[in-house]
Amino acid sequence: MKQTITAETSIEIDASPSEVWNAITTAATIKKYLMGTNVSTDWKEGSPITYEGEYNGKKYKDKGVIKKIVPEKIFRSTYWSSMAGKEDKPENYNTVTYNLDDNPDGTTIVRITQDNILSDKEKEHAVSNWKMVLQKLKEVVELAAPKN
């Protein structure tokens, strides 16, 4: 069996887990922080999830299956990218997990992990991509979050 690598990154968002959860499970909000991506799913474990859009002038349709949902805590799905140049077969899917941790100060730590990465170069790309996504998520959520 091949050794695989896991990419991980996190960010602190000045909002409640509920506000962050709504942002990661609402298609219209996802589109704001995930490069204009249109997401389709019913947000239930075992259901398919698709990501469609255009990146650098190239259309894509990525997909996966929702594996675990714990509201305001965990969102996990498999993920295959049409742009990765890999065949659409189970061993080429990553598992992407969003973990939300509630801080006593009212902020939320969002940690994203992506597994089944085959090289350090692929890991660097994943970490860079997720950092960009998390920064944009933070901006979108904090802009919408009511301030006390």
Residue spans for each PLM region:
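Intrinsic-disorder/low-complexity, polar/charged segments enriched in Ser/Thr/Lys/Arg/Asp/Glu/Gln
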Residues: 4-10, 48, 61, 74, ...
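Solvent-exposed residues in well-ordered beta-strands and their adjoining turns
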Residues: 12-14, 101, 113-117
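A solvent-exposed, acidic/Ser-Thr-rich amphipathic alpha-helical stretch
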Residues: 37-51
